[in-house]
Amino acid sequence: MSNQPAHKIKIGLITATIWNNDGSYSVDMSRSYKNDQNEWKNTSGFFHSDLLNVAKCADRAEIWISRQLATRT
């Protein structure tokens, strides 16, 4: 994997980070939150109320990756 993501998709507090490793794509999903010290942090755990945005991010990530792969052929 490169040090920089190929693309990021953000919906609300949910982020899909897309990585390109020699043409093979992977996706990390995370939720942003503020801790007790009011600092922004990320977690891979999601609440029930996050799941719709997780699904939307996953869908948009799949579309973005599919378009990238289609331009190679």
Question: What do these predicted regions represent?
Answer:
Residues 1-73:
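Single-stranded nucleic acid-binding surfaces, predominantly the OB-fold ssDNA-binding core
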